[in-house]
Amino acid sequence: MVPSRRGGDKHAAERTKVDKKSYEYLVKSGIAGGIAGCAAKTVVGPLDRVKILFQTQNPQFAKYTGSWTGFPTAVRDIWLQAGVQGLFKGHSATLLRIFPYAGIKFLAYEQIRARVIHSKAQETAGRRFVSGSLAGMVSVFFTYPLEVIRVRLAFETRAGETSNLSSIIRKIYSETAAPTSHNPTNAITATASSAVEKLTPQAGLSNFFRGFTPTLLGMVPYAGASFLAHDTMSDVMRWPVLAPYTVLPNTSRDETNTTSQKPPQLRYWAELSTGGIAGFVSQTVSYPLEVIRRRMQVGGVVGDGHRLGIAEVAKRIYVERGWRGYFVGLTIGYVKVVPMVATSFFVYERGKYYLGI
């Protein structure tokens, strides 16, 4: 229960003003975001593992896709093979990545939003979407290699495997892509193709950025829709007709660098509901690009090692499974993302409140 701000509470008085441009706000919002991300990912760790195995068409689990019983069967197989540790394989890399990722994302959103939206009149859907998209892109720039490592840890399923964080990093770094297959029709084309291959990195650090472009493209609709849906539903929950049931009293405070007032905190069920809806919307609009990204990220352990571009991966998925291939694992995605995003926004909002920002 959130404490009342009435009376002579000295700490409450100190927290009635919020300056989003202060160094303290930057640090605290980053910490709140990082903790929120870790909490959310821990809640859905097993779901995330199975979803990655489905999306990347892992040979051992591809047979379970497209069936309502596929998910529980996959969980059972992982449990029997490796126990709880198997369900959370790659989770250490997840937490290593998610703390800075979520911290940067929420911090960036607050700062970008404060500069894009200066007053209530500018509180439009377009500005909210742009703020969320830019925040998501910023976070991806700084944390993408950790995401590749996490996916590779989660992808491995062979019995007896003891791959850890350091061994996976070495594997990814040392992988050499197979030469690109091409059939040039003339000498000029052949020379150009050969030159491009020689100039294109075939191993090393570039391996940690497989799938970076679709990730960046996918972050535009995902983060944009997520923050837009959350903020919009938060407004709905605070409508006068709903406020008596959804809002905690005496929890609003002013912002020093704007003319607006920071809205009061929502009750736990209302905050979880807004986050869940945000997760559903964002997952739906961005899922095809997420599938393409996963397939690119595991390129070094499936197929012939040939490094594929977005268009080629998209084409292969369509040839293999048709348009449904772009939505493999979406049901698990919903089951995973709704509680994950709900937990993330809930912990973040509560974290900000208790940190006094």
Name each model feature, range by range.
Residues 1-357:
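Matrix-facing interhelical linker segments
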